[in-house]
């Protein structure tokens, strides 16, 4: 069966078409700048030259139609017609308390819409993508895979905030986490490499990018995770502040006269390594500036590293030990310096990496030093494949 996986953002659509016979990627692509000037489709079929098409793309329906036209194009296409697509899997950032992927029906769409308040940049566009597929490919089964689903295995004491219980119940306030599909994929892959069931392993996965989260995995379930009610919590990130004293929020609102929306912008868009460095939200820029002696870049870097080390140590305590540590996502897969800095002076936990093995970017590799108790890996994430697998399983059930 061929499965199309879609990831609809506020102004973009990413797609991959899988042949599930061998889980190969037949084509992948990206539509950018939906609804704004300069919109473009970049289509990359396996074994063929890429197609770049600049055209007006006013909405997600037009964007998805362009993706499908590229997939069936006489020269750049990889399928003859739409009927070859057996099912469609959608990445949904916020799934509330959905514990697993589900087939799309009216109740699923209603839930995604109601949860838009918790992920305004993501759930709305994803819902528009689902509705576009219903219009263009009527009758084709659709599946929603939720970034939050893997974290629904957390015990209640891990996801509960110590605010008035009634307020939390009324407003659905709890730890939801994010990047769940990525954390689950790399944990399963690491378990496969070491040749043991994930249920028997204590694992910490580090999804490090512009948005970062760390997850403790026990009995093959998420036991705790750094992101919380929203993806603002946890580590210092590219533009997000991560964990701060909550009293800072009303303090700044009073001192600076910020509205709630303005305060949200400060924490989500103007903070993190961008806010500390005053330079950039891109960790590559931070590394380069630090090498040139920029002290605020150094400070931003060290604040980030400190926050990551703190979560790894805390989660090793919660797990009562550690078997596997995994680095993934843009920074985790590609920054030699970030992995080295985070793992430095962690030998008391059994974590020690080999400097030569660590010279890797974007490739799967074990980087454990000889004699280290904890096995450390770099594993490129593959959320799309996880979504495709879930989609296939639900459609065939």
Curated annotation (Swiss-Prot):
Pfam families: Acetate_kinase. Mg(2+). Can also accept Mn(2+). One of its GO terms (cellular component) is cytoplasm. The active site is at residue 147. Pathway: Metabolic intermediate biosynthesis; acetyl-CoA biosynthesis; acetyl-CoA from acetate: step 1/2. Its cofactor is Mg(2+); Mn(2+). The record marks 179, 240 as: Transition state stabilizer. ATP binds at residues 14, 207-211, 282-284, 330-334. Substrate binds at residue 91. This is Acetate kinase. It comes from Moorella thermoacetica (strain ATCC 39073 / JCM 9320). The lineage of its organism: Bacteria, Bacillati, Bacillota, Clostridia, Moorellales.
């Amino acid at each position: 069966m061929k499965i199309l996986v879609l990831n609809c953002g506020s102004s973009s659509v990413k797609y991959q078409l899988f042949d599930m016979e061998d889980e190969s990627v037949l084509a992948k692509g990206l539509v950018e700048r939906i609804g704004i000037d300069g919109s473009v489709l970049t289509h990359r079929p396996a074994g063929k030259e890429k197609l770049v098409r600049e055209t007006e793309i006013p909405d997600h329906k037009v964007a998805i139609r362009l993706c499908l036209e590229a997939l069936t194009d006489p020269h750049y296409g990889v399928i003859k017609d739409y009927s070859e697509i057996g099912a469609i899997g959608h990445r949904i950032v916020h799934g509330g308390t959905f514990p697993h992927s589900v087939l799309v029906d009216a109740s699923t769409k209603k839930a995604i819409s109601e949860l838009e308040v918790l992920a305004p940049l993501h759930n709305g566009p994803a819902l528009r993508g689902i509705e576009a597929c219903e219009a263009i490919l009527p009758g084709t089964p659709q599946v929603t895979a939720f970034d939050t689903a893997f974290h629904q295995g957390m015990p209640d004491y891990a996801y509960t905030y110590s605010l008035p219980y009634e307020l939390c119940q009324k407003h659905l306030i709890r730890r939801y986490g994010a990047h769940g599909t990525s954390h689950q994929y790399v944990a399963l892959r690491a378990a496969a490499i070491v040749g043991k069931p994930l249920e028997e392993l204590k694992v910490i996965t580090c999804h490090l990018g512009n948005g970062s989260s760390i997850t403790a995995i026990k009995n093959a379930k998420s036991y705790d995770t750094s992101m919380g009610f929203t993806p603002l919590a946890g580590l210092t990130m590219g533009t997000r502040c991560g964990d701060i004293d909550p009293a800072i929020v009303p303090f700044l609102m009073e001192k600076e006269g910020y509205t709630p929306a303005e305060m949200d912008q400060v924490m989500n868009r103007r903070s993190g390594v961008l806010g500390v460095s005053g330079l950039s939200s891109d960790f590559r820029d931070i590394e380069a500036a630090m090498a040139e002696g920029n002290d605020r870049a150094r400070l931003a870097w060290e604040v980030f590293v400190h926050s990551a080390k703190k979560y790894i140590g805390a989660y090793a305590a919660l797990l009562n030990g550690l078997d596997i540590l995994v680095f993934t996502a843009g920074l985790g897969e590609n920054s030699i310096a970030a992995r080295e800095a985070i793992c430095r002076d962690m030998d008391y936990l059994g974590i020690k990496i080999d400097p030569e093995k660590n010279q890797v970017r974007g490739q799967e590799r074990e980087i454990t030093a000889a004699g280290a108790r904890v096995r450390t890996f770099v594993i490129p994430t593959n959320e799309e494949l996880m979504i495709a697998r879930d989609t296939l399983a639900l459609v065939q059930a």
